[in-house]
Amino acid sequence: MSVPESHRPDDSTSAELVADEPGSSWFGHPPFRLPRREVIEAPRELTHDPSAIRRLNRWCWEVARFALPAVPVLVGVAWFDVLSGLEGRLTAAEFRLVALPCVTFASAAVLVVACIAMKWALIGRVRPGTHALWSCWCSRWDFLYVAWGMWAAVPLSFLEGTLMLPGVLRRFGCRIGRRALLGAGFAHVVDPDMLRFGDGVTVQALMQAHTFEDRVLKIDHVHVRDGATIGANAVLLYGADIGERSTVAPHSVVMKRERLEPDTAYEGVPTQPVAG
């Protein structure tokens, strides 16, 4: 598939020359036409022509972002002051083996707990649904995402690939079973309430539990059933349901509301069952 004004290299071959129909949607490698796309109608005041009040609401949340870095800075200053006060009163071994790790852990915990509290204060328990771009909910949702990246992402990155990370993510709203192993990328989750992981899963993928289409945010659950394995850099779109003990190969894409059968291996963009 070639886009308008694109460049074709010398000695290349086009197998078939067919014009796309206006308004059609395509995806995949090789690309295929999507049979239909869910279109959500929303008032233009919430999508393209916001009122002055809605513009003011968005500006307030955008300006508030400038205050977010102050929290980790203050925590860092407190960390330095506490350790400076303890250094002269403890032996070198006590300072390095006890005081330093304990104060560092406490500082990281403050940032994570503050982010958890902000999540429940700003958006509470999120349900599947739709939210227009200029709604107050979208502004608060986006503000939380930025705050998580500045406050909790770095401390939680040290827990990626361990059995401790699921315990923290449950406090954010994730539903995670026992012995779940979550790899890189789960230190900063966009939609924690949408993630449903069963027992014994192994996941190192992008959970795309929302999309913005026509300036409307659509959000829904992503299910990974017991014993399933999701490879590195795979993408699961909202509504995806991975069957028990199934395997999704790295760099694959599971489409919206697609259900993968249990005990089956999948790969591709979009995913297809692997023969044998």
Regions found by a protein language model. Give the residues of each.
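Conserved short histidine dyad/triad with adjacent acidic residue
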Residues: F158-L163, L181-A184, H210-T211
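Soluble catalytic regions of membrane-associated enzymes that act on cell-envelope
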Residues: L181, F186-A187, D193, G200-T202
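Alpha-helix N-cap/loop-to-helix boundary motif
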Residues: S157-E160, F172, D193, D199, ...
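Glycine-rich hexapeptide-repeat left-handed beta-helix
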Residues: M1-L68, L195-R196, T202-G276
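Active-site-adjacent structural elements in folded domains
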Residues: P166-G167, H188, F212-L217
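Terminal amphipathic alpha-helical/low-complexity segments used for targeting or macromolecular assembly
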Residues: S24-G173, E261-G276
